[in-house]
Amino acid sequence: MKEIKEAYQQCGQIVGEYAPACFKALSYLPLKQRQASWAVLSFCHTAASADEKVLPAFEAKADHVYQRTNNGKQHLWKAFDHAYRTFTLESEPFREFIAAQKEDAKPYDDLDELLMYAYRTGGAAGLMLLPILTRRKQDQLKQAAVSLGLAIQLVRFLSDLGTDQQKNRIPRQVMQQFGYTEADLQKGTVNKAFTMTWEYIAFEAEAYLEECQDALPLFPQYSQKTVKAALHLHRAVLEKIRAKQHDVFQYHFALTETEVKQILSDI
């Protein structure tokens, strides 16, 4: 068990580095659920970070976990295998998440393409975590889990548009609707047209956060505070971006430790 504990700790460190808001929200869970959540989100981060040459090997290792034939020695596979067995997780959202990493890097035409990407990544992550967050009412809470994950993915997207990959995901039809040009995008221009484009997408993220908020009473006591914290923290990221005039090309927006403590003290 010492090896498993160390494997979980390694996963926790990864989540703390790449998704500090989620890490803070997960801190309210009981230890078993918290550790399993670290393993799941570490899986997501590793898959999302893998280049196309490495992804097939990653996918093959994941298949061994699904089939209960894992013998991986790395901390991720030890922790993920243990979490997968302990909480009887299903393979489908993990497969969906990996498949989403293989998509072409072409620019998105419309909002539906961005929402589908967010569903296949963030929404899938929500479904991965659902059996960890609740043993009962999973059918009733399925949409809430998807909505939370989808919203978080959109917030992460909206908080850092500095890379070519992220710029490609801004729906071109939405840009055209508000008069934001391709030249503006490539220069990282923040003007009224960009602000309206950003807010159009942010409205979707906030609507999904609200959907999850409505279902909050259905979550068990042990996970309610985690879900509530995630909702508040990701709303706060959007508000911070607004306060800084939407300059998401130059800066990656994240909450400071002081801001996180203040937000969590109010929930």
Curated annotation (Swiss-Prot):
Signal peptide: none annotated. It comes from the Bacteria. Its EC number is 3.1.7.6. InterPro entries: Isoprenoid_synthase_dom_sf, Squ/phyt_synthse. Diphosphate release from FPP is inhibited by zaragozic acid. The keyword Cytoplasm does not apply. Disruption phenotype: Loss of biofilm formation. Loss of a dark-orange pigment from cells, alteration of cellular lipid profile. Significant reduction of proteins found in detergent-resistant membrane (DRM) fractions. Decrease in membrane fluidity, about 30% decrease in protein secretion. Transmembrane segments: none annotated. The keyword Methyltransferase does not apply. Keywords: Hydrolase. Changing residue 164 to A: Loss of diphosphate release. It catalyses: (2E,6E)-farnesyl diphosphate + H2O = (2E,6E)-farnesol + diphosphate. GO terms for molecular function: 15-cis-phytoene synthase activity; hydrolase activity. Belongs to the phytoene/squalene synthase family. Monomer. A farnesyl diphosphate (FPP) phosphatase. Involved in biofilm formation, its disruption blocks biofilm synthesis which is restored by exogenous farnesol. Releases diphosphate from FPP, was initally suggested to be a squalene synthase. Diphosphate release is higher from FPP than geranyl pyrophosphate (GPP) or geranylgeranyl pyrophosphate (GGPP). Biofilm synthesis is partially restored by exogenous squalene, beta-carotene or retinol. Required for integrity of cell membrane lipid rafts. This is Farnesyl diphosphate phosphatase YisP.
